[in-house]
């Protein structure tokens, strides 16, 4: 009897120790996330504004949704609906600043690092924190983050990492995937699909690897697991379709999110061309994101080495990378933040370093590399900077007519709407990549129909006889000096 009670006591003590370790880890990772996002994200309160056009477009749509505007129908952009819902939540926290986006970024990085920590514990890694700090710094100081923060790729990282960790946990334990596992993977894949469907190459590779593993591990559960994952995937999709149907704009959602994206970013025709572009993309990103790419590449091969006796785990990494990379870069558009999901592989570098170095050396190495990475961040030099063309133009508009409408005609939404609390009255309220002539004509029609009083352009002189140039300023965007112009309508009807 005494042995039984002693055994129970040891179990309780072990559980208590594990919970204390988890609480300590969570607190440390939250602190790292808070530090990194606060210092390096332009959404942080240390910066006057986040000037990145994409993040401002997302937030403008989120703010518009709170005022009754419909995504895709009333305000146009071509990312997934779940992203705009996240930005609507951010706008609920603050509709005149990026405070809500900042909080979402902190939580997103924390969740990602938490998943990395769980994986490192699974791999029995000693001293994981120096490596996790370095990974966090590598993310927020990379060129992929220098636009300002708040990209789809950044917010999708924890979802991708959670599925990777869950899959490796089952494979390394040689366990079959449960109903809950398959359903959850399906839900998370659907969530990413509803943010940016080209990221789902990650899940295509994961699905192939898990089907092969499950077929060997417990073939009788294979079909059930596939159906459970499909069911999980369909839940968010069907809810989305239902909500758009009830809102009366399902056709706009389908035309924009699928029709526009598939037509404006066509895949290359031949396999050789695709392979060439994939190779070219890697060297483009190596040049623009050297630390992130090197960490991730070395981490990828470190993971393959780590699992050399676990072919299912090794194949999982290879298939995820190939499918994600292939689908992401078969086109001819390379933008810095597209590569950000590759950082998921960097975590496999930490166990190898941990085995070869003691804690003090790891801390010193992590601190030194973190400082070097920080010097490469283009965001840091704008901390505390005050005064902007957005503030000047909006102040001028409001001094003439506090309730006057204004629109970006030639240029990106860089916070002009946010500065004045303006909800655009035209569907095409900002320039976007691959803009069509139809969009430009519809924007001009909206300007005339709704008698927009003020127009703002970037690097373009407007040739509109009914508008006069009233102000011109230079400002920095994407590392280059731009010329901004403010026009006023001559005669309002």
Question: Where do the model's predicted regions map?
Answer:
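Short periplasmic/luminal acceptor-recognition loop of GT-C membrane glycosyltransferases, typified by
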Residues: 382-437, 441-463
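Transmembrane-helix signature of polytopic, membrane-embedded enzymes
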Residues: 116-140, 157-158
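Membrane-interface transmembrane helices that cradle and orient dolichyl/undecaprenyl
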Residues: 121-126, 161-184, 291-292, 297-313, ...
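Transmembrane-helix motifs of polytopic, lipid-linked glycan transferases
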Residues: 103-124, 162
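Hydrophobic/aromatic-rich transmembrane helices and adjacent perimembrane loops
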Residues: 201, 325-360
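Hydrophobic, aromatic-rich transmembrane alpha-helices
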Residues: 32-35, 114, 287-325
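Membrane-interface alpha helices of multi-pass inner-membrane proteins
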Residues: 180-208, 235, 321-330
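Short acidic/glycine- and proline-prone juxtamembrane loop motifs at membrane-interface regions
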Residues: 145-155, 335-336
């Amino acid at each position: 009897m005494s042995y039984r009670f002693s055994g129970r006591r040891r179990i309780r003590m072990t559980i208590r120790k594990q919970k204390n370790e988890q609480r300590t880890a969570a607190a440390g990772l939250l602190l790292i996330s808070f530090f990194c996002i606060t210092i390096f994200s332009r959404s942080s309160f240390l910066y006057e504004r986040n000037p990145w056009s994409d993040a401002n477009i997302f937030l403008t749509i989120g703010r518009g949704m709170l005022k009754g505007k419909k995504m895709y129908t009333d305000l146009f952009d071509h990312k997934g609906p779940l992203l705009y819902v996240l930005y609507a939540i951010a706008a609920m926290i603050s509709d005149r600043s990026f405070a809500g986006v900042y909080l979402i970024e902190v939580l997103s990085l924390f969740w990602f690092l938490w998943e990395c920590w769980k994986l490192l514990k699974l791999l029995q890694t000693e001293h994981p924190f120096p490596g996790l700090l370095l990974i966090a710094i590598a993310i927020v100081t990379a060129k992929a983050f220098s636009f300002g923060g708040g990209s789809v790729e950044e917010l999708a990282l924890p979802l991708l990492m959670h599925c990777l960790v869950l899959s490796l946990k089952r494979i390394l334990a040689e366990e079959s995937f449960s109903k809950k596992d398959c359903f959850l993977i399906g839900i998370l894949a659907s969530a990413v699909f509803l943010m940016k469907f080209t990221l789902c190459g990650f899940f295509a590779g994961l699905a192939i690897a898990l089907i092969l593993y499950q077929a060997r591990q417990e073939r009788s559960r294979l079909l059930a697991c596939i159906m459970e994952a499909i069911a999980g995937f369909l839940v968010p999709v069907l809810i989305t379709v239902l909500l758009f149907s009830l809102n009366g704009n399902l056709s706009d959602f389908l035309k924009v999110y699928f029709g526009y994206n598939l037509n404006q970013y066509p895949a290359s025709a031949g396999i050789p061309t695709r392979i060439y572009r994939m190779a070219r993309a890697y060297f483009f990103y190596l040049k623009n994101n050297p630390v992130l790419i090197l960490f991730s590449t070395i981490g990828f091969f470190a993971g393959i080495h780590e699992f050399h006796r676990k072919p299912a785990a090794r194949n999982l990494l290879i298939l995820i990378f190939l499918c994600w990379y292939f689908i992401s870069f078969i086109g001819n558009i390379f933008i810095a933040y597209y590569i950000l999901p590759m950082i998921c592989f960097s975590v496999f570098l930490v166990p190898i370093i941990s085995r070869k170095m003691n804690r003090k050396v790891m801390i010193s190495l992590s601190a030194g590399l973190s400082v070097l990475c920080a010097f490469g961040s283009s965001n840091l030099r704008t901390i505390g900077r005050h005064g902007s063309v957005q503030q000047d133009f909006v102040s001028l508009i409001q001094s003439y007519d506090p309730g006057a409408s204004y629109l970006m005609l030639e240029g990106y939404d860089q916070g002009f709407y946010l500065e004045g609390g303006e909800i655009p009255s035209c569907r095409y309220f900002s320039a976007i990549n691959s803009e069509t002539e139809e969009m430009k004509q519809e924007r001009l029609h909206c300007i005339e129909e709704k008698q927009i009083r003020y127009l703002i352009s970037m690097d373009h002189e407007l040739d509109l006889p009914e508008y006069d140039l009233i102000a011109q300023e230079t400002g920095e965007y994407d590392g280059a000096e731009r010329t901004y112009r403010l026009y006023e309508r001559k005669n309002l009807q």
